[in-house]
Amino acid sequence: AYAWREWNAAHNSMPHVQSGASAARTPSSYPKADIRKTDTYLTMGLDWDHNKIEFLYRLKKQIGFRINCVAYDIIPVLFPHFYSEGADQFFAHYFSNMAWIADHIFCISECTRKDLKKLLVELGTPVPEMSVVRLGDVLPEIRDQHHSEQVKQVAKERFILMVSTIEIRKNHHILYKAYVRLLEQGYTDLPTLVFVGMPGWRVDDFMFTIRQDKRVSNKIVVLNRVTDADLALLYQSCAFTVYPSLYEGWGLPVAESLAYGKFCLTSNTGSIPEIAGDLLHYIDPWDVVGWAENIKKYAADTQALEHKLQEIGQRYKTTSWHETASSILKQL
């Protein structure tokens, strides 16, 4: 369904961009670009909803400069049921277009590189040269140390942290089920489970459930619109973090957790195992019992948790965003 038109032997035109953005500005209305043949145009991946790719293709044909792109993941194509109807086709067209114009694609994980290469082969497009760059995980130093009263109250007690937009793919629901299971079994001395993130799409029923379920009313807290200072305090103060995502192109909250020296219970899917290997504890994202048992274990067994924290401190190497930028610039 996503197969693209065959490459024109004469290279006279690029396949038409088939997206909802096609009614946007026409190429003739763009500001005149001073691009030379020796230049490299780098797009960081925020062009998927703009009508610029065909324009870039024609400009590249005319001038001969290089185009490098960044690919984060192809999750809407792989798992269309996580998104609105038509998102899979929209993104398949975007990646197809990217393949026609790119000389090089930077992927944020080996998982993304393999997923994208497989997709492009299936689409019948060119497969540009690809390389993997590691994303930064060091949050900037926070000068303003003002914290909200709600966050300060949360940080006073023992808690487990999950940082992510609240959406189906991030799988907050499995943690809710794990907590209910433990509470029903009589394990009432559990740390508070703190969700940090804005509600996304298709989670209204879930948000209603955790608000109305009296079993978790004092055990699950949702924080949103937190400041950088608040987020830093939460990372620093939590017992450990959890991240049961169903699929990732990288998994930045996992890396940020490790950068703060915090252990993470995480799912074993997508790119996540690339982040830190055996420093993490992996659980099937659908395994309610597995999540419940391991949350209970690391919440109660301070010695096991301390061993993990020591390993992270000794072995995890953080990556600055400057290092990420430098690794890209060196390959341009």
Model-based region annotation:
Residues 1-332:
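Carbohydrate transferase catalytic cores enriched for Leloir-type hexosyltransferases
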